Amino acid sequence: MSENQNLILNRKDTGRYLMKIKLYSAPVISLKENAIIDSVLLKMQLNNIRTVLITSEKKPRGIVTETDIVKFLEDDKTNRALDEIPVTEIMKEKVISITDEQQDHLNQCSQRMEIFKIGSIIITDEDGVARGITTKTDITSAFSVMYQGKCKVKDYMSKNVVTCRKSDSIQYALNMINKNGISRLIVTDQFGNPTGLITRNTFLRYANNIKKSSKKALDYWNPTDLDIALPIEKLLDQDVLVLNLEDDLAEAAKLMVKNLVGGIPVINNERKLVGIVTKSDVVRAFSEVESNSQLLEKYKQTH
């Protein structure tokens, strides 16, 4: 483990050790540029990850996300087998990275995630060799420890929430995600109360489970007529978490990390759905709070 991989937090009042915060995961899960989509899917499933780095001579060549694969499977009409499709056909060639010697690591990563609207930053050594990856989960985990009591959920949540009812079909839910360009969909009961959360990964796992014998991209992704008719509640595998408007954003971040979820619905005092807070919102909060802290520190040093 690199000595740069963790940040030691000390209590400001006593100077005593408080907690070690992971700056990035290492080694980064990767495949060579001659890989196929089938291999990428397998890597994601085996390692429970949403991003795979594509390398050439151990240096970043491109990056593939869960969203990239979902969009490709929806759009590809060639009827090719998954082991016939090269990863270079779907990967993004622009890889955003910083070196493992970078000062202010978490802030640098959160700022880049915000600017480029991405979910991960690749960490390299001074020679450009990939060493690790910092994800929104890492930033969210750090925020839960570093900024307790600093922000409220209501200040960073998204108020425009896209929903579907649990009785709606699987196909309808998928269409809602695609139409609105979102990563997750809140599922409600007939009264509009949140009962679950569906993500792109939910559909990937479902497609994999029902199409084990098929290797065609078209068959892998497109459900049969019977599957289309199934209600979305069939894919809900856990009770939904909820947050209140006045909850501490750091506690919300801790809940996301602990429960392996990327977003949590927000309700008001009448238990009505009023928004959703996601890891992306936490990343935004981190970048703002950290930047403000640095500005304040510089002000103190000059006045």
Which residue stretches match the model-derived regions?
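Tandem CBS (Cystathionine beta-synthase) repeat/Bateman regulatory domains
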Residues: 1-303
